Amino acid sequence: RNYADPNKLICVMKNPAHQLAAKIQYESGLRIAGATSIRPEQLRGITSDKFTGKAVAHLNYIGKGGKAGIAQMSPDTYGQLVEHIARHGSFAVSQDGYRGALKQAAKLTGQQYNGSHGLRWNFARERFYELQAAHVSYETALGAVSNELGHNRIQITYHYLGLD
């Protein structure tokens, strides 16, 4: 359900806004609605990841069921987002157009199309292993990924990680 090479997928996308939405989704685990519609007041700046200590950028969002959350992404992607918002007033991408671009990119790179949700799967797995590599306990890493995905039940995160 995840992409074999999400970076390659993102690189072949022709529209820079679609590329940016894909980077945001891949790096933050946001659902498509959160990654394709961002207003300036959601931007929270750059800080340190509380688990790894690396520099990350934060973004407030309202997720599924009206649940508030904080997404994080690389400072580079955040910088691109800030630039886009400075030029256009907000970041707004057609979800259908974005899905079509992902489908085309999957075809061009020989990967199975897994929708935009496939990038959430990539995020979940890579984030979990990043936390484990930083010596975060299994339970804490699982809880962190679950929270970052906006899930209320850890059982759903087991599914994303292929642990069920």
Regions found by a protein language model. Give the residues of each.
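Catalytic phosphate/metal-binding cores of nucleic-acid and nucleotide-processing enzymes, i.e., regions
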Residues: N15, P40, T47-D49, L59, ...
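Conserved tyrosine-mediated DNA breakage-rejoining catalytic core shared by Y-recombinases
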Residues: S37-Q80
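Basic, Lys/Arg- and aromatic-enriched nucleic-acid-binding interface segment
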Residues: Y3-I32, E139
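DNA major-groove recognition helix of helix-turn-helix
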Residues: G34, R39, Y160-L161
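Short, leucine-enriched amphipathic alpha-helices that occur as contiguous helical runs
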Residues: P6, A17-Q19, R99, R120-W121, ...
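Catalytic-site neighborhood detector that most strongly recognizes the C-terminal catalytic loop/helix
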Residues: G65, E148-D164
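Active-site-proximal segment of tyrosine recombinases
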Residues: A35, N114, A124, Q132-G150
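Active-site/catalytic core of tyrosine-dependent DNA strand-transfer enzymes
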Residues: Q72-E130
